[in-house]
Amino acid sequence: MTAPKVGINGFGRIGRLVLRAAIEKGTCQVVAINDPFIDLDYMAYMLKYDSTHGRYAGDVSIKDGKLQVDGNSITVFAHRDPAEIPWATAAADYIVEATGVFTLKDKAAAHFKGGAKKVVISAPSKDAPMFVCGVNEAKYTPDLDIISNASCTTNCLAPLVKVIHEKYGIEEGLMTTVHATTATQKTVDGPSNKDWRGGRGRGRNIIPSSTGAAKAVGKVMPELNGKLTGMAFRVPTPDVSVVDLTVRLASETTYEDIKATMKAAADDSMKGIMKYTEDAVVSTDFIHDDASCIFDASAGIMLNSKFCKLVAWYDNEWGYSNRVVDLIAHISKVQ
């Protein structure tokens, strides 16, 4: 079966890393990129050099008005309106909507006017069905034309929650994500009418913030709807975040048994999605880790046989971008 042909709308952090991941994995072929704010020369530069993930190891060049990456010829568009992007001229069937702007179904549907067949939104969506690899991707059906890959935090939390809930049952839980800074934050204090704290300078503050990541687990695992919620602390690091899940279990257990359960999942049912470590790790140890969730066995604690705190790391850029590629590869095989 030939690799699905992919177009990327928005060549920001996720857009560029989805391209890297697609080429590295070889399961998807990126044939087109649309970004009205970046010209072709700058696009090549931004792909080649990355302050967090390092210089691109392959060949990046420009030929005949197209971006050339490791022998892949990629058509480049510069349209602000998704409805004007001629995806069909580049044979792009699967569109990664990575602008962060067109996250509602009616907005994302504009891609169909240019010939797209499926749209995967690389962000949470209020009305598009959300899928998390390793959790509920098997529920995807071919009639779904617009779907969401959820958020990077939900991609870390949901596999962790799935393993725990299936073994012990979850009565209720609170999640905190200590989250790396992102491009939407201010470098220095600036106006942010909807979120006053979010307008404070990202380089010198720990900033409490809201997140729908925990509630979103209820959308991919309906049996947990209403049982989880959470919040975030934005911290001045460029990449890698960590989930802190405090959870009340339905059945009694020990922390040693939880560790064994998580390790078994990482080695089997969640292989490729989840990893397990007992090492004395810190955040930079997971830069460019392609897992959705790395369970930190040495960081968790247990108050009693039904109440525990579980810790899991994730590269909120690279791990998530790999799941976007995996999700496209999966849905392309579902007929």
Swiss-Prot record:
Q: What is catalysed by this protein?
A: D-glyceraldehyde 3-phosphate + phosphate + NAD(+) = (2R)-3-phospho-glyceroyl phosphate + NADH + H(+)
What's the source species for this entry? Chondrus crispus
Q: What class of enzyme is it?
A: oxidoreductase
Task: State the superkingdom.
Answer: Eukaryota
UniProt-annotated binding residues for D-glyceraldehyde 3-phosphate:
S151, C152, T153, T182, T211, G212, R234
Outline the subunit composition. Homotetramer.
What GO molecular function annotations does the UniProt record carry, in alphabetical order?
glyceraldehyde-3-phosphate dehydrogenase (NAD+) (phosphorylating) activity; NAD binding; NADP binding
Q: Where is the active site?
A: C152
Write out the entry's keywords from A to Z.
Cytoplasm, Glycolysis, NAD, Oxidoreductase
Report what the protein is called. Answer: Glyceraldehyde-3-phosphate dehydrogenase, cytosolic
Q: Where is this site: Activates thiol group during catalysis?
A: H179
